[in-house]
Amino acid sequence: MSAVIENHHDDHDHGPAKGITRWLYTTNHKDIGTLYLWFSFAMFLIGGAMAMIIRAELFQPGMQIVEPEFYNQMITLHGLIMIFGGVMPAFVGLANWLVPMMIGAPDMALPRMNNLSFWILPFAFFILLSSLFMEGGAPNFGWTFYAPLSTTYAPPSVTFFIFSVHIMGASSIMGAINVVVTIMNMRAPGVTLMKMPLFVWSWLITAYLLIAVMPVLAGAVTMMLMDIHFGTSFFNAAGGGDPVLFQHIFWFFGHPEVYIMILPAFGIVSHIIETFSRKQLFGYSSMVLALLSLAILSFVVWAHHMFTVGLPLAAEIFFMWATMLIAVPTGVKVFNWVATMFRGSLTFETPMLFAVAFVVLFTIGGLSGLMLAIVPADFQYHDTYFVVAHFHYVLVPGAIFSIMAAVYYWIPKWSVNMYDERLGKLHFWLSFIGVNVTFFPQHFIGLAGMPRRYPDYALIFADWNMVSSIGAFLFGFSQLLFLFIVIKTVMGGKKATDQVWEGAKGLEWTVASPAPYHTFSTPPKVD
């Protein structure tokens, strides 16, 4: 009995510390998830401001508001910040908040490493953004940083860019290890692998992808560093190297990377469609199998980014075939989402609107991707605005809509307050219209031959560029409404129930709203 009394002080739930130290020292998965989400939103706004500069320059032909050198810095930083600062930290934040609650774990497996993996990120982006103020300007070679533009002809700030990418990679690897260890070791009794929520499955697979490909990116930028400062010739033909080697290494990282940015979105959308259809998700095991297939296939398609570089014909045929194969598991997922909605009791709250838009617009992005997979056609499409339209249709209504859907869906559980449904729907429709007005016309100007990454263009492309820019400003400014909605919700509002949504299933809906600082200190029993 005495042992129980001695340890009694351990039974109290310790709430968060007061003030700034709560956030600096926190090892709580909910606090770290919140930090990731706010950080990602800040980066989303910075990357978005850069996109606004790009679209303002392209509003009319001719040189308008920025120098060509600065334009190139904008397209480089916009891509890097949106991918490594906007989308990825948002999904890691959602993983931190939700994965432990969904599997009945008290926290992440490695809480101190969790803190470290977040707090090195602001430094990485401070270093990256500080390059704007250096002599020679920021990196200007595009987010894919192809050598020799990023080595022989790079501005001096490239060294800071390399260091920044290393820090981001370290953060991603630590976060991914944490997710894998948590999911493999900390599931509550009864939560078998095939009973895990799909968001948890999608993150388990994503984490393995991160662990596999982040070291490849680190290798690529290290070889760049050696070429720039230490006299090697990895990518310098004059010294026996090969610039195409860089492209192979980069895209071996880069293609799994784009799946890292979409697999968690698949998990989120599966949950939301299931909830608002008020029926069980159609084809759970095939959804898991499709996620696994996509992850495996993502490693054997990288050279479809390089069809015009002079690959052997046999390689072009293989990569075309492998890329088209990607459509099969993706089609399975889209079919299952539609089948889940079929004859369901549908209601269209804001999360569901974003999820349905995701399914429709992601499919459009997938179809244009199938066109790009065809080698002879890609010789025409490559490096035109058709490619820009394709990947933005997958990333904006894909990854970003799913993140917004997730925030609307889970914020009542996080904050106990319901968001303003009318404002949420207004935000959805502004975003939906903005995205389509921005990126749909880019298919047309791309097919007509307008190349990417130029601040000026021929007169024939003027009309659609103006339309695209108007859509971009509509989409960009409507995100300020999203910021307002989130702050308003956190500050107060109609109180949510514990379940929040009729039809919501899963362990996270069994805890109180707002989710207590410590959940599942005793593991729940799952049938």
Residue ranges and their predicted role:
Residues S2-D527:
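Membrane-embedded and interfacial regions of multi-pass energy-transducing membrane proteins
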